[in-house]
């Protein structure tokens, strides 16, 4: 199976898992649950679930076990987008080519749906059937996702990002923002896949952390590039939004060509990290292909 087929299969699997975990929730057919479904299920690259599946499969973990962490990390991602789009944050009206949640369902339902998706993520990890995961590793997975989602990770990065609007931000500070805002959850996705494999996955965490940090920054650099050279129809969100908000970006700091070079260098670093795992007879091809996809994508 080539990478596009692999990726498409992952999208389908992640969507099925998300639907399965959302379907039994109470208050079906109410605006809040409809907002949750809209925010979590309509579109999206499913990059983070792919990282969970690819990392777990590399260690021989079954898809059945990986469905829970894949859905959990995507619930956190979906909640973060719903809240990021709110008027008090980035004030976006378009996401994945559709009206944002607060535009379609109102701000109150968007806030509640985001809150509910966040807590659903931890319910999934604590309660779901993961036959290959020990209690110790399940607790580690919950702790990992909590750390990546909170003030030490994604929320902290968003706070730094909001504070930096309209200011000149040096490269080191910009990377700090994105290691937290974007990188923390990408790192968590890789770690959840590894932790699902127990001790053999734990032993690989230092190498996988280097890989995840490199692709996390590369993902953001490419996002910044696409905000300059992309178009709204392809991106599914407003092109040029970062510039309108006065945000520092990699193209603004480095220039477009140097930003592209930085993204390529980061992906080279990621691939180099994986060589240590390939030398242990682990199949890293899916993670390598995902790294290349990150800087080849157009949305």
Place the predicted regions along the sequence by residue:
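N-terminal amphipathic/basic leader segments beginning at the initiator methionine
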Residues: 1-23
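Mg2+-dependent prenyl diphosphate-binding active-site environment of isoprenoid biosynthetic enzymes
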Residues: 12, 22, 26-273, 283-295
């Amino acid at each position: 199976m080539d990478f596009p087929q692999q990726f498409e299969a992952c999208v389908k699997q992640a969507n099925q898992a998300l639907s399965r975990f959302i379907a039994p929730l109470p208050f079906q057919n109410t605006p809040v649950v409809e907002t949750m479904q809209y925010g979590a299920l309509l579109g999206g690259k499913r990059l983070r679930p792919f990282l969970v599946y690819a990392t777990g499969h590399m260690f021989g973990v079954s898809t059945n076990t990986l469905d829970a962490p894949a859905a959990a990390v995507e619930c956190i991602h979906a909640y973060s987008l719903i809240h990021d789009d709110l008027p008090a944050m980035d004030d976006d009206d378009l996401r994945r080519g559709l009206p944002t949640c607060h535009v379609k369902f109102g701000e109150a339902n968007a806030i509640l749906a985001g809150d509910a998706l966040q807590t659903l993520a931890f319910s999934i990890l604590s309660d779901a059937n993961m036959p290959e995961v020990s209690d110790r590793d399940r607790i580690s997975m919950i702790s990992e996702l909590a750390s990546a989602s909170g003030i030490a990770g994604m929320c902290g990065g968003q706070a730094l990002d909001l504070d930096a609007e309209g200011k000149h931000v040096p490269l080191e500070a910009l990377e700090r923002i994105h290691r937290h805002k974007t990188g923390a959850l990408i790192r968590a996705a890789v770690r959840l896949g590894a932790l699902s494999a127990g001790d053999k996955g734990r032993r690989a965490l230092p190498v996988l952390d280097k890989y995840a940090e490199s692709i996390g920054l590369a993902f953001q650099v490419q996002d910044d590039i696409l905000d300059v050279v992309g178009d709204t129809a392809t991106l599914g969100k407003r092109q040029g939004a970062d510039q309108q908000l006065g945000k520092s970006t990699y193209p603004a700091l480095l220039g477009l060509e140097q930003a592209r070079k930085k993204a390529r260098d980061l992906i080279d670093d990621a691939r180099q990290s994986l060589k240590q795992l390939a030398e242990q007879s682990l199949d890293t091809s899916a993670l390598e292909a995902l790294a290349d996809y990150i800087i080849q994508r157009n949305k």
